[in-house]
C-alpha cells in the first residue's frame, strides 16, 4: 500500500484526484500545502525539491520509500488499488480513456468558461460562448453514456469517475446553473452519486451546486480588454539582442511563467503578451544586482543570509520600496480565489520580473481576508505606468512608497520577505504568501 507526502497548494482540484483515490485504496497520504512546511512558489523552486521533481510542479508525491512522481493523473494512479485502475485489461483501458478525455476535452473549455469568473483569466465573449457549447456537448456525451450505467466504467467507482468528477467540479460549482444542467439528468445523477460517496466527501466536503451562473465582472476587469487605440509594441529591442548569451538565458529563466500551478490554459492565455522595448532602458546603471539577491533568497536562509545581503547591497537611488494593499477586501470570499487574484496579477506582470521583486500575502480566512505586499522596483516611481501591459491590476491596490531607512520599512521587509512576524498593522493571521521573482 502506498504511503507518502503530497505537495500541493490549497484547494487544488488536481490534487483532489489522488486524495479521493487514497480514500478508496487506503493509501496513507499526508498533505503539505501551507507554511511552514510547504511554501508554494518558494519550496517547490528549491534545488532539493527540483532534484526530486525536475518540473517544479505540484501536486507532487514523495513516497516514504523515496519514490517520487509528479503529474496529478500519475499520482492518482500510483495511490490507487486494482479496482480503481480497472480490474481487467478492458476496464483498465476504459479508465485511461476517460482520464485522457478529461484532460483533452473537458479541461480546455472548462478553463475558458470558469477562469474569467474567478478573476484569473482574461474574458473573451466569443471564446466563452464557444466553451459553453463545448461543455454542453461534453455533458450530453456523458449523459448518453450514463443512461444505462451507474458509473463510467463497470459497476463501481474507478479512477475514471474520480478524474472526470474533479475536472467537472468547478463547472458545477461556478457556472452550471439549474437551467443549464437540467438537460443532462443522467450526468447530474452520476455527479451527485459520486460527490456524496463518503470517500469523495472526505476530500471535497459538501459540494454546493451553482444556483446562478457566475459572470465575468466587467467593471472590475474592463481594463483587461484590449484597447483599440493602443499601438502594438515592437517585438524586440536592439539592446536585448546584443546582450550576452549567458545573460539572456538567465533572464529567460527568471521571466518564465511558473509551471507548477498546472493551470495550462490560463497560463497560456496570460503569458501571450507581445514583446516590448525595455521600459527601464533610460535609467542609469545600478550597483544592486536583483538577480543575485533572488538567488540568495531562493537558496539561502531568508533571515540570516538573504535579508542581510539585501540591505547591504540595496541601492536606494536606483531602486525603490513600495507597500501595496488590495482596495476591495469586502469582495474577497474563498481564500483560494483570493490567492488566484495574486497569481493572476503575477502572471500578467511576467515581463516585469527582471526589474522587480515582491512578497504578497493573503491574511485571514474565508470571507474575512486581506491582501497586502512589499515590492522592490527599479527606479523611483511605480513601474506599472511604464507599459500598458502592466496596467491591468495595479489600480486595484493602494500604493505607498517606503523609506528604506525607516524602522517601519525594516520591519515590513523582514516580515513580508520571511513570512514571519506579528504583522500588527494587518490585524489578521497569516494565511499564505506568494513571491514575485
UniProtKB/Swiss-Prot annotation:
Name under which the protein is recorded: Elongation factor 1-gamma
A Pfam entry, by short name: EF1G
Coiled coil: none
Keywords: Acetylation, Elongation factor, Isopeptide bond, Protein biosynthesis, Ubl conjugation
UniProt domain GST N-terminal: residue ranges: 2-87
Membrane-spanning intervals of the chain: none
Assembly: EF-1 is composed of four subunits: alpha, beta, delta, and gamma.
Residue ranges annotated for the GST C-terminal domain, each copy included: 88-216
GO terms of molecular function: translation elongation factor activity
Record flagged with keyword Acetylation: yes
Gene transcribed to yield this protein: EEF1G
Sequence positions bearing N6-acetyllysine: 147, 212, 401, 434
Cellular component annotations (GO), alphabetically ordered: cytoplasm; nucleus
Amino acid at each position: 500500500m502506498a504511503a507518502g507526502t503530497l505537495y500541493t497548494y490549497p484547494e487544488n482540484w488536481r490534487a483532489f484526484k489522488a486524495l479521493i483515490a487514497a480514500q478508496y485504496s487506503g493509501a496513507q497520504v499526508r498533505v503539505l500545502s501551507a507554511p511552514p512546511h510547504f511554501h508554494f512558489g518558494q519550496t517547490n523552486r528549491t534545488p532539493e525539491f527540483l532534484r526530486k521533481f525536475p518540473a517544479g510542479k505540484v501536486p507532487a508525491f514523495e513516497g516514504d520509500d523515496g519514490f517520487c512522481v509528479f503529474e496529478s493523473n500519475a499520482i492518482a494512479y500510483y495511490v490507487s488499488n486494482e479496482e480503481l485502475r480497472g480490474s481487467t485489461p478492458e476496464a483498465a483501458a476504459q479508465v485511461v480513456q476517460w482520464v485522457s478525455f478529461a484532460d483533452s476535452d473537458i479541461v480546455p473549455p472548462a478553463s475558458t468558461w470558469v477562469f474569467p469568473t474567478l478573476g484569473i483569466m482574461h474574458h473573451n465573449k466569443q471564446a466563452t460562448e464557444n466553451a459553453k457549447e463545448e461543455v454542453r456537448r461534453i455533458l450530453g456525451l456523458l449523459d448518453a453514456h450514463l443512461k444505462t450505467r451507474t458509473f463510467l466504467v463497470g459497476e463501481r467507482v474507478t479512477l475514471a469517475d474520480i478524474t472526470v468528477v474533479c475536472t467537472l467540479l468547478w463547472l458545477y460549482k461556478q457556472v452550471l446553473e439549474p437551467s443549464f444542467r437540467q438537460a443532462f439528468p443522467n450526468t447530474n445523477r452520476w455527479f451527485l452519486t459520486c460527490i456524496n460517496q463518503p470517500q469523495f466527501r472526505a476530500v471535497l466536503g459538501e459540494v454546493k451546486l451553482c444556483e446562478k451562473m457566475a459572470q465575468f465582472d466587467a467593471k472590475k476587469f474592463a481594463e483587461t480588454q484590449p484597447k483599440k487605440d493602443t499601438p502594438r509594441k515592437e517585438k524586440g529591442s536592439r539592446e536585448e539582442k546584443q546582450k550576452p548569451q549567458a545573460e539572456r538565458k538567465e533572464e529567460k529563466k527568471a521571466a518564465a511563467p511558473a509551471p507548477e500551478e498546472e493551470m495550462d490554459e490560463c497560463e497560456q492565455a496570460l503569458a501571450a503578451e507581445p514583446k516590448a522595448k525595455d521600459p527601464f532602458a533610460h535609467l542609469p546603471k545600478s550597483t544592486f544586482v536583483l538577480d543575485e539577491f533572488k538567488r540568495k533568497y531562493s537558496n539561502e536562509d531568508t533571515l540570516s543570509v538573504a535579508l542581510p545581503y539585501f540591505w547591504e547591497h540595496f541601492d536606494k537611488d536606483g531602486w525603490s520600496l513600495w507597500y501595496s494593499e488590495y482596495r476591495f477586501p469586502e469582495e474577497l470570499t474563498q481564500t483560494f480565489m483570493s490567492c488566484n487574484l495574486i497569481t493572476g496579477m503575477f502572471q500578467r506582470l511576467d515581463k516585469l520580473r527582471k526589474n522587480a521583486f515582491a512578497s504578497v500575502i493573503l491574511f485571514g480566512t474565508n470571507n474575512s481576508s486581506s491582501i497586502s505586499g512589499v515590492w522592490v522596483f527599479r527606479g523611483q516611481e511605480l513601474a506599472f505606468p511604464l507599459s500598458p501591459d502592466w496596467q491591468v491590476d495595479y489600480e486595484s491596490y493602494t500604493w505607498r512608497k517606503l523609506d528604506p531607512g525607516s524602522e517601519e520599512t525594516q520591519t515590513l521587509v523582514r516580515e513580508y520577505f520571511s513570512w514571519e512576524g506579528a504583522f500588527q498593522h494587518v490585524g489578521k493571521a497569516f494565511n499564505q504568501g506568494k513571491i514575485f521573482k
